[in-house]
């Protein structure tokens, strides 16, 4: 048995852990969990835990549903919730999903991302990610479709006396850091009740695990604080939606492959081609980075979110931004993709972003001129004249672009690609047939 497994088993005994929660994610990004007793973990390390894959969104047909979860000891963390006596009785690990013969499950989002990271490794790169995760903190209420109520009326960077959101963020960060998830900073975002917590850079697979843990922790802490948290992309029509701005960089060993001291923006040819790849394939990957009907209520003109495939230095109206906070710091040269929302599947999102960027690097895509103006203020004609393609404005148009994409099919694999399209086509059809309160208010008098 390797040292990581021995460490986990020893920690369970020393800290008297009573429950080990084995986590994995379905294709749509929902967290799944099975709890086992510590005495069963050594066997789980050796043989895995069998489950019905046909009961998990996108995993398997009922006729071939035997699936196995293998805990990854490198992801072991004690959960931060304690009993009244202060005893932390539960821990968690993420799992890799396989078929009974030991082959990887093509439906496992971790496997989808790992395949892209392997491809990056074959090109000599490792990928690091730093997300800015936004969400809403709401007052308790029924989940019956009624209008939610934010916990406050604060705005961007606001500091209030007896600020419930401030207390919430402090408790959430304590819980995250207890689990070894480093937080860079946190603050109130622009809309009432809207929060942002930024996680410190990590390798892409660890970060996807961290994002899933983050969403779980945030919801748990919100309940403890007498509130509820929502990662819905756009719960309020009159306010900005919740993004997951995704900062990415490629490293060759310890060297940032995106940095060049000779460039005015300190951006290397690798970095430029990576951005060009994101822009070229932006429409194709939108259904993954923004997977819900509601996602496209956020990606609208004036909504503080990108609507065209453009890039710029320090330009927050562009799809891809090159942050310029520390222009001469080699390790910090990165690109920020501003379209993903915080309700995406982080494994699939990082996979398609990496696939698009690597395609640009492999094929030597040439990056066009940067956007120096506010892209939101440009007319459609001006955008076309500048070569900025419009991003999909609905889930339907995003699915059409994805369906024709060889890149996304290759990045996700045939199984996930086909399931995702079928599932999202059903979601769109259900939405189209639904009569909304807006329609009743507007058209009932006809």
Swiss-Prot record:
Regulation: Inhibited by glutamine.
Site of covalent link Isoglutamyl lysine isopeptide (Lys-Gln) (interchain with Q-Cter in protein Pup): 363
Domain GS catalytic per the UniProt entry, residue ranges: 109-446
Binding site for Mg(2+) 1: 132, 245, 336
Residues noted as binding L-glutamate in the record, renumbered to the chain: 241, 298, 304, 316, 338
Catalytic activity: L-glutamate + NH4(+) + ATP = L-glutamine + ADP + phosphate + H(+)
Binding-site residues for ATP, renumbered to this chain: 184, 247-249, 316, 321
Cofactor binding notes: Binds 2 Mg(2+) ions per subunit.
Enzyme Commission identifier(s): 6.3.1.2
GO biological process terms, semicolon-separated: glutamine biosynthetic process
Origin: domain of life: Bacteria
Residue ranges occupied by any GS beta-grasp domain in the UniProt entry: 15-102
Keywords: ATP-binding, Cytoplasm, Isopeptide bond, Ligase, Magnesium, Metal-binding, Nucleotide-binding, Ubl conjugation
The protein, known as: Glutamine synthetase
Organism the protein comes from: Mycobacterium tuberculosis (strain ATCC 25618 / H37Rv)
Lineage, opening ranks: Bacteria, Bacillati, Actinomycetota, Actinomycetes, Mycobacteriales
